[in-house]
Amino acid sequence: MTWPLIKNSITWKDRFLLSKFIMTSDKFTQGSKVRAFEKEWSDWSNTKYSVFVNSGSSANLLLTSAVTELYKIEKNAKILTSVSTWATTVSPIIQLGYTPVFCDTDLGNFCFDLSHLKKLSEQYKEEIKIIFVPHLLGLKAPVSVY
């Protein structure tokens, strides 16, 4: 059995609206539509601010940078993440000077294997400063159990 990595979820209506926007707008980034989207997203997610970026890769880099700066995480600190993830989850960890620690995957939900997570937490005790929980392939990780 094979599963497609992703299916095209963009409808013809979406394509039409996007092409109309491109043809009639002189600003594609940081314009009024982006600010309106950020505001609407903040309202929906019940957060004070939102920042729209071009990709999940950029979002991961921005998130890792912001969290490590906010909590004053020193370089070379260990950040735990799943072994089953995209390179764009791991790349910001390395790019920003941190050390990734990989947790095995529970094949039932493609999230952390809880027994391995416990083993790693005992092995590294206070060394792991951040747990980066990827929600792989649209599957929501059960973060409340971590």
Predicted features along the sequence, with ranges:
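Pocket-edge positions in alpha/beta enzyme catalytic cores
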Residues: 7, 25-29, 102-104, 109, ...
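Glycine-rich phosphate-binding loop at the start of an alpha helix
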Residues: 53, 57, 87, 111, ...
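Conserved PLP-anchoring active-site segment centered on the Schiff-base-forming lysine
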Residues: 64-123
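A short beta-strand submotif of the Rossmann-like class I SAM-dependent methyltransferase core
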Residues: 52-55, 81, 130-133
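Conserved PLP-binding active-site segment in aminotransferase class I/II-type PLP enzymes
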Residues: 1-74
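Generic structural signal for small/hydrophobic residues in well-ordered secondary structure
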Residues: 18-19, 41, 59, 79, ...
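Active-site phosphate-binding strand-loop segment of PLP-dependent enzymes
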Residues: 108-146
